[in-house]
Amino acid sequence: MAVQISKKRKFVADGIFKAELNEFLTRELAEDGYSGVEVRVTPTRTEIIILATRTQNVLGEKGRRIRELTAVVQKRFGFPEGSVELYAEKVATRGLCAIAQAESLRYKLLGGLAVRRACYGVLRFIMESGAKGCEVVVSGKLRGQRAKSMKFVDGLMIHSGDPVNYYVDTAVRHVLLRQGVLGIKVKIMLPWDPTGKIGPKKPLPDHVSIVEPKDEILPTTPISEQKGGKPEPPAMPQPVPTA
């Protein structure tokens, strides 16, 4: 028997489920370029789509890893047997995904690459992928004992207004190095895309599109136009004289 819950509780429960699932997959698939999760609920089953840059690693050998993840999710969230399905989907444009770039920068810093060089490499890759702008902030004990932050910016970046919600993709990650924990924040401003594949369909409010004038067909031969004047009033019938 299904338990009836209010709409408010339903929204809260869905939010908690997605947040917990996202945290679990972030820990589990960090090395495989995990970039987010989508949950689609149908009347018969729940479909969980994992977005990643290396989908083959997520699936595992002969689909073993995805089956293990399905079993863990099913047990943790109390889904009935066979009612949850996990899929792996490749991220179309890795350079426009903030989570993927934050993870990439994290592994570069763990590998011992200099902060400035690693950040400029990520910045260049993002801009080459077609982004309108990007911002990378690394904070912590970068050099010496005193904590400080370094900001790297390129292109255009909006910070306020409603378009921030759908134009700016943000990700925050932490990396533990020998000198302490560094914080990584990546912000990517997506380009406007009428098809909606690599960016929002809705243009920015200040976007101005210039419409090309239509080609006027010029007359090849002289044409005379007769403009009609005022129509003459109909003649009144003349009275017939009587003898």
Curated annotation (Swiss-Prot):
Coiled-coil stretches noted in the UniProt entry, renumbered to this chain: none
Chain positions with N6-succinyllysine modification: 132
Compositionally biased residues, Pro residues: 231-243
Cross-link (Glycyl lysine isopeptide (Lys-Gly) (interchain with G-Cter in SUMO2)): 214, 230
Residues carrying N-acetylalanine: 2
InterPro entries found in the cross-reference section: KH_dom-like_a/b (IPR015946), KH_dom_type_2 (IPR004044), KH_sf_prok-type (IPR009019), Ribosomal_S3_C_sf (IPR036419), Ribosomal_uS3_C (IPR001351), Ribosomal_uS3_CS (IPR018280), Ribosomal_uS3_euk/arc (IPR005703)
Consequence the record notes for mutating residue 230 to R: No effect on sumoylation. Abolishes sumoylation. Does not affect ubiquitination in response to ribosome stalling
Isomerase is among the record's keywords: no
Principal place of residence: cytoplasm
Activity regulation details: Endonuclease activity is inhibited by MgCl2 on apurinic/apyrimidinic DNA but not on UV-irradiated DNA.
Membrane topology per record: Peripheral membrane protein
Single GO term (MF): protein kinase binding
Record-linked Gene3D superfamilies: 3.30.300.20, Ribosomal protein S3, C-terminal domain (3.30.1140.32)
Subcellular location field: Cytoplasm; Nucleus; Nucleus, Nucleolus; Mitochondrion inner membrane
Outcome of swapping residue 42 to A: Abolishes phosphorylation by MAPK and translocation to the nucleus following exposure of cells to hydrogen peroxide. No effect on phosphorylation by CDK1 or PRKCD
GO BP annotation list: apoptotic process; base-excision repair; cell division; cellular response to hydrogen peroxide; cellular response to reactive oxygen species; cellular response to tumor necrosis factor; chromosome segregation; cytoplasmic translation
Record bears the keyword Nucleus: yes
Keywords in alphabetical order: Acetylation, Apoptosis, Cell cycle, Cell division, Cytoplasm, Cytoskeleton, DNA damage, DNA repair, DNA-binding, Isopeptide bond, Lyase, Membrane, Methylation, Mitochondrion, Mitochondrion inner membrane, Mitosis, Nucleus, Phosphoprotein, Ribonucleoprotein, Ribosomal protein, RNA-binding, Transcription, Transcription regulation, Translation regulation, Ubl conjugation
PTM annotation (Phosphoserine): residues: 6, 35, 104, 209, 224
UniProt-annotated stretches for the region Disordered: 214-243
Role this protein plays: Component of the small ribosomal subunit. The ribosome is a large ribonucleoprotein complex responsible for the synthesis of proteins in the cell. Has endonuclease activity and plays a role in repair of damaged DNA. Cleaves phosphodiester bonds of DNAs containing altered bases with broad specificity and cleaves supercoiled DNA more efficiently than relaxed DNA. Displays high binding affinity for 7,8-dihydro-8-oxoguanine (8-oxoG), a common DNA lesion caused by reactive oxygen species (ROS). Has also been shown to bind with similar affinity to intact and damaged DNA.
Known partners and oligomeric status: Component of the 40S small ribosomal subunit. Identified in a IGF2BP1-dependent mRNP granule complex containing untranslated mRNAs. Interacts with HNRPD. Interacts with PRMT1; the interaction methylates RPS3. Interacts with SUMO1; the interaction sumoylates RPS3. Interacts with UBC9. Interacts with CDK1; the interaction phosphorylates RPS3. Interacts with PRKCD; the interaction phosphorylates RPS3. Interacts with PKB/AKT; the interaction phosphorylates RPS3.
UniProt protein name: Small ribosomal subunit protein uS3
UniProt source species: Homo sapiens (Human)
Lineage of producing organism: Eukaryota, Metazoa, Chordata, Craniata, Vertebrata
This protein's encoding gene: RPS3
